[in-house]
């Protein structure tokens, strides 16, 4: 008899689940026995490939296009998930954007878009998830934060601010939802080699050399933290941030 996975039979929804860390998390959850809704926004082929990979692992999956900044779109996303899977055990708020620009070159639209994707998106998705999870009297919400929410980075003002806000959101939401059996935590990765960060190759190499582990992280380096926070093993974790960052910061 095959050994049950840590997430056997659970139903997960991962925003931005078609690429990068989100895709790796969706696949890791499937490998541990979960069925997954892959929410995507820009590339249907990536989403379809992720779904196919999950199905190849013996789990069920659907891909749903969603704009996490839109209340109507988020409502439709969660309706699609519920119609297919009936319940929601795990939400991963991973959808995000990143842009490097100096303060004087940052438009109000740039600023508001960054905050909308990271903060409004997490708010809308968490609110929708909480409705389902309260009925079940249990659930897990995992927010994808960033070490830049702690230390900032020049020319990443909007992104660093959004991620700092998401850290505060994670802690406050954890205190609100814990009495309902819903555990909210976050993962704050360091620089991960996914192509998401606009740093040059030379800058990434220099950054890697500065780390105690002397290399950038990979999506696979991130997934154990996400599996842990979605599993029963994290039953006493509430409002906590895990830091897979190669030792760059040690909060």
Predicted regions and their residues:
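Alpha-helical segment proximal to the catalytic Tyr-Lys
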Residues: 131, 175-176, 235
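Conserved glycine-rich cofactor-binding loop
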Residues: 18-19
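Substrate-binding pocket helix/loop in short-chain dehydrogenase/reductase
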Residues: 102-103, 110-115, 207
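Residue(s) in the substrate-gating loop at a strand-loop-helix junction
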Residues: 146
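Short, small/polar-rich loop/turn modules that mediate ligand/substrate recognition or access, typified
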Residues: 87, 178, 183, 237-239, ...
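Active-site helix of classical SDR
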Residues: 126, 162, 170
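Short C-terminal tail/terminal secondary-structure segment
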Residues: 1-3, 151, 227, 238-251
